[in-house]
Amino acid sequence: MLLRFTKMHGLGNDFMVLDLVSQHAHVQPKHVKLWGDRNTGIGFDQLLIVEAPSSPDVDFRYRIFNADGSEVEQCGNGARCFARFVQDKRLTVKKSIRVETKGGIIELNIRPDGQVTVDMGPPRLAPAEIPFQAEREALSYEIEVNGQRVELAAVSMGNPHGVLRVENVDSAPVHSLGPQLEVHPRFPKKANIGFLQVLDPHHARLRVWERGVGETQACGTGACAAAVAGIRQGWLQSPVQIDLPGGRLHIEWAGPGQPVMMTGPAVRVYEGQVRL
Protein backbone atom coordinates (compact mmCIF):
# COMPACT_ATOMS: atom_id res chain seq x y z
CA MET A 1 0.00 0.00 0.00
CA LEU A 2 1.00 3.62 -0.55
CA LEU A 3 1.09 6.04 2.38
CA ARG A 4 0.93 9.81 1.97
CA PHE A 5 3.51 11.73 3.98
CA THR A 6 4.79 15.27 4.41
CA LYS A 7 8.44 16.27 4.80
CA MET A 8 8.85 19.13 7.30
CA HIS A 9 11.55 20.81 9.33
CA GLY A 10 11.91 22.98 12.40
CA LEU A 11 15.17 24.97 12.16
CA GLY A 12 16.70 22.24 10.00
CA ASN A 13 15.69 19.41 12.37
CA ASP A 14 13.85 17.41 9.70
CA PHE A 15 10.88 15.07 9.88
CA MET A 16 8.73 12.72 7.89
CA VAL A 17 5.15 13.21 9.13
CA LEU A 18 2.50 10.49 8.72
CA ASP A 19 -1.24 10.96 9.22
CA LEU A 20 -2.55 7.69 10.67
CA VAL A 21 -5.91 9.24 11.52
CA SER A 22 -7.24 9.22 7.95
CA GLN A 23 -4.81 6.49 6.79
CA HIS A 24 -4.45 3.11 8.44
CA ALA A 25 -1.16 1.23 8.67
CA HIS A 26 1.09 -0.53 11.17
CA VAL A 27 4.51 1.10 11.02
CA GLN A 28 7.35 -1.04 12.37
CA PRO A 29 10.95 -0.11 13.31
CA LYS A 30 12.20 -1.78 10.11
CA HIS A 31 10.10 0.66 8.05
CA VAL A 32 11.43 3.63 10.03
CA LYS A 33 15.05 2.59 9.45
CA LEU A 34 14.40 2.03 5.74
CA TRP A 35 12.70 5.40 5.23
CA GLY A 36 15.15 7.25 7.46
CA ASP A 37 18.23 6.40 5.38
CA ARG A 38 19.38 9.61 3.67
CA ASN A 39 21.04 7.69 0.83
CA THR A 40 18.44 5.07 -0.03
CA GLY A 41 15.26 6.31 1.65
CA ILE A 42 13.51 9.60 2.36
CA GLY A 43 15.95 10.69 5.06
CA PHE A 44 15.02 12.41 8.32
CA ASP A 45 16.01 12.92 11.94
CA GLN A 46 12.66 11.64 13.22
CA LEU A 47 9.42 10.12 11.96
CA LEU A 48 6.36 11.81 13.49
CA ILE A 49 3.07 9.90 13.57
CA VAL A 50 -0.33 11.54 14.07
CA GLU A 51 -2.85 9.17 15.66
CA ALA A 52 -6.35 9.47 17.10
CA PRO A 53 -6.34 10.19 20.84
CA SER A 54 -6.81 7.48 23.45
CA SER A 55 -8.57 9.94 25.78
CA PRO A 56 -11.31 12.56 25.27
CA ASP A 57 -9.15 15.07 27.17
CA VAL A 58 -6.71 15.44 24.25
CA ASP A 59 -6.99 16.10 20.53
CA PHE A 60 -4.33 13.76 19.12
CA ARG A 61 -1.71 11.20 20.00
CA TYR A 62 1.83 12.14 18.89
CA ARG A 63 4.43 9.39 18.42
CA ILE A 64 8.11 9.97 17.62
CA PHE A 65 10.64 7.54 16.15
CA ASN A 66 14.34 8.23 15.65
CA ALA A 67 15.88 7.27 12.32
CA ASP A 68 17.37 4.16 13.97
CA GLY A 69 13.83 2.85 14.61
CA SER A 70 13.71 3.57 18.35
CA GLU A 71 10.59 5.24 19.75
CA VAL A 72 11.27 8.25 22.00
CA GLU A 73 9.23 10.25 24.48
CA GLN A 74 9.37 13.79 23.17
CA CYS A 75 10.55 16.11 20.38
CA GLY A 76 10.02 19.85 20.68
CA ASN A 77 10.84 20.84 17.09
CA GLY A 78 8.65 17.97 15.96
CA ALA A 79 5.80 19.24 18.15
CA ARG A 80 5.76 22.54 16.27
CA CYS A 81 5.69 20.70 12.94
CA PHE A 82 2.95 18.42 14.31
CA ALA A 83 0.79 21.48 15.09
CA ARG A 84 1.33 22.98 11.63
CA PHE A 85 0.64 19.60 9.97
CA VAL A 86 -2.74 18.93 11.64
CA GLN A 87 -3.82 22.48 10.74
CA ASP A 88 -2.66 22.24 7.12
CA LYS A 89 -4.31 18.83 6.69
CA ARG A 90 -7.55 20.12 8.26
CA LEU A 91 -7.46 17.42 10.91
CA THR A 92 -8.49 20.21 13.30
CA VAL A 93 -9.59 23.83 13.08
CA LYS A 94 -8.37 24.63 16.59
CA LYS A 95 -5.51 27.09 17.05
CA SER A 96 -4.71 25.53 20.42
CA ILE A 97 -4.51 21.76 20.77
CA ARG A 98 -3.66 19.26 23.49
CA VAL A 99 -1.54 16.30 22.45
CA GLU A 100 -0.57 13.13 24.29
CA THR A 101 3.01 11.88 23.93
CA LYS A 102 4.99 9.07 25.48
CA GLY A 103 6.54 11.76 27.72
CA GLY A 104 3.25 13.37 28.82
CA ILE A 105 0.66 15.87 27.58
CA ILE A 106 1.77 19.06 25.81
CA GLU A 107 -0.18 22.05 24.50
CA LEU A 108 0.48 23.57 21.07
CA ASN A 109 -0.58 27.06 19.99
CA ILE A 110 -0.35 28.33 16.41
CA ARG A 111 0.29 32.08 16.31
CA PRO A 112 -0.95 34.47 13.59
CA ASP A 113 2.64 34.95 12.36
CA GLY A 114 2.94 31.21 11.69
CA GLN A 115 5.24 30.56 14.63
CA VAL A 116 4.19 27.82 17.04
CA THR A 117 4.38 28.04 20.82
CA VAL A 118 4.62 24.75 22.69
CA ASP A 119 3.78 24.42 26.38
CA MET A 120 6.28 21.69 27.23
CA GLY A 121 5.08 21.36 30.82
CA PRO A 122 7.36 21.70 33.86
CA PRO A 123 10.87 20.23 33.64
CA ARG A 124 11.57 17.14 35.71
CA LEU A 125 14.63 17.58 37.88
CA ALA A 126 14.48 14.69 40.35
CA PRO A 127 17.08 12.08 39.28
CA ALA A 128 14.57 9.20 39.31
CA GLU A 129 12.26 11.10 36.95
CA ILE A 130 14.91 11.98 34.34
CA PRO A 131 16.16 9.16 34.77
CA PHE A 132 19.69 9.84 36.05
CA GLN A 133 21.59 7.88 38.66
CA ALA A 134 22.29 10.14 41.65
CA GLU A 135 21.55 9.96 45.36
CA ARG A 136 19.86 13.37 45.47
CA GLU A 137 18.84 16.26 43.22
CA ALA A 138 21.54 18.85 42.51
CA LEU A 139 22.11 21.80 40.18
CA SER A 140 24.91 19.85 38.49
CA TYR A 141 26.63 16.49 38.71
CA GLU A 142 30.18 15.32 38.15
CA ILE A 143 30.57 12.17 36.08
CA GLU A 144 33.60 10.36 34.72
CA VAL A 145 34.22 9.60 31.05
CA ASN A 146 37.42 7.75 30.15
CA GLY A 147 39.17 9.06 33.24
CA GLN A 148 38.01 12.64 32.57
CA ARG A 149 35.66 14.39 35.00
CA VAL A 150 32.77 16.22 33.35
CA GLU A 151 30.28 18.50 35.10
CA LEU A 152 26.77 18.60 33.69
CA ALA A 153 23.17 19.37 34.61
CA ALA A 154 20.53 16.66 34.19
CA VAL A 155 17.01 17.66 33.11
CA SER A 156 14.01 15.86 31.63
CA MET A 157 11.70 17.65 29.21
CA GLY A 158 9.76 14.42 28.73
CA ASN A 159 13.07 12.97 27.51
CA PRO A 160 16.47 12.90 29.28
CA HIS A 161 19.07 15.62 28.74
CA GLY A 162 22.57 16.36 29.97
CA VAL A 163 23.72 19.99 29.64
CA LEU A 164 27.38 21.10 29.74
CA ARG A 165 28.58 24.70 29.73
CA VAL A 166 31.38 25.38 27.25
CA GLU A 167 33.41 28.46 26.34
CA ASN A 168 32.67 28.19 22.61
CA VAL A 169 30.28 25.78 20.91
CA ASP A 170 32.31 25.95 17.70
CA SER A 171 35.21 24.13 19.35
CA ALA A 172 33.14 22.01 21.77
CA PRO A 173 33.81 18.22 21.65
CA VAL A 174 30.29 17.45 20.42
CA HIS A 175 31.27 14.49 18.24
CA SER A 176 33.74 12.94 20.69
CA LEU A 177 32.19 13.58 24.11
CA GLY A 178 28.56 13.64 22.94
CA PRO A 179 28.28 9.95 21.99
CA GLN A 180 30.11 8.87 25.14
CA LEU A 181 27.80 10.83 27.43
CA GLU A 182 24.72 9.70 25.44
CA VAL A 183 25.27 6.10 26.55
CA HIS A 184 26.84 6.81 29.97
CA PRO A 185 25.54 4.29 32.54
CA ARG A 186 24.29 7.09 34.79
CA PHE A 187 21.67 7.78 32.10
CA PRO A 188 19.80 4.41 32.13
CA LYS A 189 17.68 5.36 29.08
CA LYS A 190 20.55 7.18 27.36
CA ALA A 191 20.39 10.96 26.91
CA ASN A 192 20.53 13.94 24.59
CA ILE A 193 23.66 15.97 25.32
CA GLY A 194 23.67 19.77 24.99
CA PHE A 195 26.78 21.97 24.78
CA LEU A 196 25.80 25.46 26.00
CA GLN A 197 27.67 28.72 25.44
CA VAL A 198 26.27 31.69 27.40
CA LEU A 199 26.57 35.02 25.55
CA ASP A 200 24.62 37.15 28.04
CA PRO A 201 21.78 36.49 30.55
CA HIS A 202 19.14 36.40 27.79
CA HIS A 203 21.14 34.92 24.91
CA ALA A 204 22.99 31.63 24.42
CA ARG A 205 24.29 29.29 21.73
CA LEU A 206 23.71 25.54 21.75
CA ARG A 207 24.74 22.40 19.92
CA VAL A 208 23.04 19.09 20.71
CA TRP A 209 24.09 15.48 20.26
CA GLU A 210 20.72 13.72 20.06
CA ARG A 211 20.14 10.25 21.43
CA GLY A 212 19.87 7.73 18.60
CA VAL A 213 20.47 10.39 15.92
CA GLY A 214 23.75 12.27 16.43
CA GLU A 215 24.19 16.02 16.08
CA THR A 216 21.18 17.78 14.56
CA GLN A 217 20.61 21.30 13.28
CA ALA A 218 18.29 22.00 16.19
CA CYS A 219 16.74 20.28 19.20
CA GLY A 220 13.70 21.89 20.79
CA THR A 221 13.68 19.89 24.01
CA GLY A 222 17.46 20.39 24.16
CA ALA A 223 16.98 24.17 23.99
CA CYS A 224 14.38 23.97 26.77
CA ALA A 225 16.66 21.81 28.93
CA ALA A 226 19.61 24.15 28.34
CA ALA A 227 17.53 27.20 29.29
CA VAL A 228 16.30 25.49 32.46
CA ALA A 229 19.83 24.42 33.42
CA GLY A 230 21.21 27.90 32.73
CA ILE A 231 18.47 29.66 34.70
CA ARG A 232 18.89 27.30 37.66
CA GLN A 233 22.64 27.91 37.68
CA GLY A 234 22.18 31.70 37.50
CA TRP A 235 23.86 31.96 34.10
CA LEU A 236 20.63 32.86 32.26
CA GLN A 237 17.38 34.72 32.90
CA SER A 238 13.98 34.20 31.26
CA PRO A 239 13.19 34.88 28.45
CA VAL A 240 16.14 33.32 26.65
CA GLN A 241 17.03 33.31 22.96
CA ILE A 242 18.79 30.04 22.10
CA ASP A 243 20.75 30.04 18.83
CA LEU A 244 21.23 26.59 17.31
CA PRO A 245 22.99 25.75 14.02
CA GLY A 246 19.58 25.75 12.29
CA GLY A 247 18.23 28.96 13.79
CA ARG A 248 16.75 30.56 16.90
CA LEU A 249 14.24 29.44 19.53
CA HIS A 250 12.58 31.62 22.17
CA ILE A 251 12.34 29.94 25.60
CA GLU A 252 10.50 31.16 28.70
CA TRP A 253 10.53 29.55 32.17
CA ALA A 254 9.32 31.20 35.38
CA GLY A 255 10.98 28.69 37.70
CA PRO A 256 10.38 25.38 39.54
CA GLY A 257 6.94 23.87 38.99
CA GLN A 258 6.20 26.18 36.05
CA PRO A 259 5.89 25.09 32.40
CA VAL A 260 8.60 25.75 29.83
CA MET A 261 7.28 27.68 26.82
CA MET A 262 9.09 27.26 23.51
CA THR A 263 8.36 29.34 20.38
CA GLY A 264 9.78 28.77 16.91
CA PRO A 265 8.99 28.05 13.24
CA ALA A 266 7.61 24.97 11.48
CA VAL A 267 8.10 24.59 7.73
CA ARG A 268 6.52 22.24 5.18
CA VAL A 269 9.05 21.11 2.55
CA TYR A 270 7.18 18.72 0.25
CA GLU A 271 4.48 16.04 -0.01
CA GLY A 272 5.09 12.48 -1.12
CA GLN A 273 4.01 8.85 -1.08
CA VAL A 274 5.90 5.84 0.19
CA ARG A 275 5.21 2.13 -0.17
CA LEU A 276 4.67 0.18 3.05
From Swiss-Prot:
SUPFAM superfamilies registered for this protein in UniProt: Diaminopimelate epimerase-like
BP GO terms, sorted: lysine biosynthetic process via diaminopimelate
Catalytic machinery residues: C75 (proton donor), C219 (proton acceptor)
Enzyme class: isomerase
Superkingdom per UniProt: Bacteria
Localization of this protein: Cytoplasm
Entry GO CC: cytosol
Role description: Catalyzes the stereoinversion of LL-2,6-diaminopimelate (L,L-DAP) to meso-diaminopimelate (meso-DAP), a precursor of L-lysine and an essential component of the bacterial peptidoglycan.
Family: Belongs to the diaminopimelate epimerase family.
Alphabetical list of HAMAP family matching this protein: DAP_epimerase (MF_00197)
Name of this chain's protein: Diaminopimelate epimerase
Organism from which the protein derives: Pseudomonas aeruginosa (strain ATCC 15692 / DSM 22644 / CIP 104116 / JCM 14847 / LMG 12228 / 1C / PRS 101 / PAO1)
